[in-house]
Structure formats: structure tokens, C-alpha cells
């Protein structure tokens, strides 16, 4: 080994140093990453002898770089610190710089295998490749994204935060004087007291003016007419009784004074007959409302069973027909003039023939109206029409909904 090294050294003294080829530019260098060469970890004795001989040679340019190699040997940790402070370059610049350094280092080698590059550049390359430590993936991603250790939340901290959400506040909340209310897509400050007053007024107005439906209106009108019908029943009964009493008083005993009846009653005949007809119509309709005429068989069965409401409706209807049958007689009484007057409708001796059936019909009407009023007063709240028209409709809807669900 020594002989070979000596011979090579003599040849090195005899031969002049070779001229270095030109360094290629950055555009000529391909961007592909060169394969990493395994760094030499151990120095062989031959390399040590070559380094010693290289130091003795005066023509080598490496004499000026001896202090850097000495400093590297004395302070091996210096390149590591310099590498840690060095910022990381982008991928393209890093590949280009590494390719430059690798190409320049390969070109600066002579035939003897000794690097002609300054020792300082080798020192910079060597720790960058050798002292590169592999970091875990999580820490590497965290460093690239700029995440600090304080920003990382562990499982224990999350459990503590979840527990703190459900804890009751220790302090006592106090009401604030101003409240922000949204008006026309903007929040405006308002006093709490005024807001409470306005809400109270709104509640009162809602209580006073509830929303009505058509069913509620129909039910209210029906009940109001039933009250009017009850009043008409009593008033009709009183008017009919008063009418028959006045007729018998004016006619005298055994209808002996019919001329007096005609003279006194002619002013009352037409107005009273109209009032009687109106009251009879209202009472008859009110009595019919209390019967379920949608089911005629049920109405007939109630009449045959002497139901008070069915009997009252039948009696009112009969009284109305009888009253209408005597309408012409009432008109004739209203136009009464003595027989001695020319153009009179009443001849002598026919008063009793005309008035006697009229008095009997009025007596029957009074009896029928009185009996009907008694029957209805026995059960004044009974109203089958209300139960069938309103209550049954409410019950029919759920049945229809059930049928629809069953069919679906």
C-alpha cells in the first residue's frame, strides 16, 4: 500500500493539475433528483495516509482550507447547529442546488481520487445528508402547518369542557334595563317596562278578539235564534190568551152583543192578526229546530211516543194553519161599517154567522199555543238539530281519516 501511494505521489508531483471543466448552468441541469450516495462513515488507513500526503504538498489549493478542517475536527457539533438554523428551501430550488453541488463535486475530482473542492463545502454537504433525522409523521405535518403544542387538544381536555357545559352557573343573573328587539330587519333598543306593557296589551286584545270560524258563527246564530224562539213561544201564548179574552168580553154573554164587538175590535183585528201570524211562524220554526227532521222515521216515532218537543211542533203547525184560514174574516172585520151605510160589506143578520166560527178558531189557536208553550217549557234546552248538525260533524272527520289511513 505504501509503495503504491508513494508512486502515485511522485506522479502527482511531476504532473501539473488538470484544468477544471466549465460548470453547467442551472437551465442545463435536469430537475430530476439524483440518487443519494451512501456517505462514507469510516475512514480507511489509506485515505488517512492520502490526506497526510496531501497536506505536505505545496501546490495543492487545500492548504488555505486547513483551518476549516481542523475546526471541523475540533468542533464536530458546529455543522449540526448551522443546519438546524437553516431555513428549508422549496422543492425545486433544493433539487437544483443539490444537483449543482453533486455535479461540481464530481467534476473537481482528479485522477488520483482526491477531491479538489474546498473543505468548507464538503463540510456543509456532509452534515446535511448524514445528520438528517427522521421525524414522526404527525410532528412533521404539525411543523409544516405551523401548529404549536398549545393548539393540540387532548382527550382529557375535551371531557373537562363537556362537563363544564352542563354545570349550573354560580352567579345570579340580573335583568337588564334595555332589550334589543328586531324591527324591520334591524335590532333596536327598547325599555323592558314598555315592552312588557305592549305584550300585556297584545294578550288582552287576543283574549277579547278570538278567532272565529264559520262553524262557530253558525252555532252562535243557531243558539241566538233558539233564545228568540223561547221568547216568541211565551209571548205568543200570552197574546193568544189576551185575544180570546178581549173577544169574549166585547161579545157579551152568549155572544149577544156582536155589533159592539165589530165596532170596538175592527181597529185591532188587522194589526193583531199580523202579529199573531209572525209569532206563530217563529214559534213553529223554533219548534221544528228541536226535532231531527233529517231522520223522518225517528221524528214520527217520537210523535207517536208523545214526545213533548214533537207534540209542540205539531201543535204550532196546526195553529199556524188555522190562523191563516181566518185571514179573510179578519180583513172583513177591519173594514166593518154598519149595514145602514151604503156600500157596507156587512148585511143585517149575518154577523153571528160570520163571527161565530172566527171566535171558535181563535179559541182553538189560543189553546194550541198554550199547550205547545207548556210542552216546550218542560224541556227548554233540548235541541236535536244542534247535536246532529255540529257535534256529529266533528265526530265524522276522525272516522274519515281512519278510513283513509286504512285504505292507504
Swiss-Prot record:
Name recorded for this polypeptide: Transmembrane protein 237
Domain of life: Eukaryota
Major subcellular location class: membrane
Gene: TMEM237
Record carries keyword Phosphoprotein: yes
Residues bearing the modification Phosphoserine: 25, 49
One cellular component (GO) term of this entry: cilium
Record's subunit section: Part of the tectonic-like complex (also named B9 complex). Interacts with TMEM107.
Composition bias, Low complexity: 95-106
GO terms of biological process kind: cilium assembly; regulation of Wnt signaling pathway
Protein purpose: Component of the transition zone in primary cilia. Required for ciliogenesis.
UniProt membrane topology term: Multi-pass membrane protein
Compartmental location: Membrane; Cell projection, Cilium
Basic and acidic residues biased stretches: 1-14, 60-77
Keywords carried by this UniProt record: Cell projection, Ciliopathy, Cilium, Cilium biogenesis/degradation, Joubert syndrome, Membrane, Phosphoprotein, Transmembrane, Transmembrane helix
The UniProt record lists the keyword Transmembrane helix: yes
Residue ranges of the TM segments: 227-247, 268-288, 303-323, 358-378
Region (Disordered): 1-137
Disorder this protein is connected to according to its UniProt record: Joubert syndrome 14: An autosomal recessive disorder characterized by severe intellectual disability, hypotonia, breathing abnormalities in infancy, and dysmorphic facial features. Neuroradiologically, it is characterized by cerebellar vermian hypoplasia/aplasia, thickened and reoriented superior cerebellar peduncles, and an abnormally large interpeduncular fossa, giving the appearance of a molar tooth on transaxial slices (molar tooth sign). Additional variable features include renal disease, abnormal eye movements, and postaxial polydactyly.
UniProt family annotation: Belongs to the TMEM237 family.
